[in-house]
Regions:
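Sec-dependent signal peptide recognition
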Residues: 1-8
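Beta-sandwich/jelly-roll carbohydrate-recognition scaffolds of carbohydrate-active enzymes
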Residues: 21-225
Length: 225
């Protein structure tokens, strides 16, 4: 009987003892989820950044065809410090966009509203809902011949190495293979790209005026300023 009780006790202790947990292979966990892109897809843009600054690219590894991604996931270059406000010629005050409400705390509190009636309060609310807005710092892409179209970019093989923060973009353009590596500085608002190709390619810089929109590419190319 004693032997039986002893055996049952040891069995119970063994059942309650959890096996030693294995360490997580973080590198394998991250790298097996690296996103891959094989087409010029407006919903498949990739980004590199450092938490304070980010740069989003198309399938070329730069921002060569921003118009293709305009209505998808736009190609942005934005930072935590890059903000802009439109002029305030009517001199709207913040308090003009606030209304007192009783939330049951024993006193009235100011709350930002969006009036529907067309009066000064609505205009003030509309202005403060738009301003300030994040600024697109500029488009940086390949300078290609005018007749080159997005469909001319073939054999796309692009991946984001999330462990090292590198976007590798391989493609052919007019039978010329290209390889572009895109990175962001881990602490500064800087990006770098390495281009390998048999044919020389230039780099273009375009600086848009902001739109103040909520769901657009933040690029106004019609403004004179």
């Amino acid at each position: 009987m004693k032997h039986t009780i002893y055996a049952l006790t040891m069995f119970a202790l063994a059942a309650c003892t959890s096996p030693q947990e294995e360490a997580i292979d973080r590198h394998a966990l991250v790298t097996r989820n690296n996103p891959e892109v094989t087409a010029m897809d407006s919903l498949s843009s990739l980004s590199v950044g450092n938490g304070e600054f980010a740069y989003t690219v198309d399938a070329t590894g730069l921002q060569t065809f921003p118009e293709v991604y305009k209505n998808g996931v736009p190609l942005g270059t934005q930072s935590q410090w890059g903000w802009h406000s439109f002029g305030n010629p009517e001199n709207y005050k913040p308090e003009e966009a606030l209304v007192e409400y009783d939330f049951g705390h024993g006193h009235k509190e100011l709350y930002a509203t969006q009036p529907k009636e067309p009066d000064r309060a609505k205009e003030a609310s509309d202005w403060y809902r738009v301003n300030p807005h994040r600024l697109h710092l500029g488009i940086i892409g390949l300078e290609l011949e005018n007749e080159v179209r997005p469909s001319d970019v073939q054999n796309i093989q692009q991946s984001l190495d999330m462990w090292n923060g590198i976007i590798n973009s391989r493609f052919t353009l007019k039978e010329t293979p290209y390889h572009i590596q895109t990175v962001c500085h881990p602490e500064r608002d800087m990006i770098a790209a390495r281009l390998s190709a048999q044919q020389p390619a230039g780099i273009k810089f375009h600086f848009p005026y902001p739109t103040g929109g909520h769901c657009d590419d933040a690029c106004n190319w019609e403004a004179n300023d």
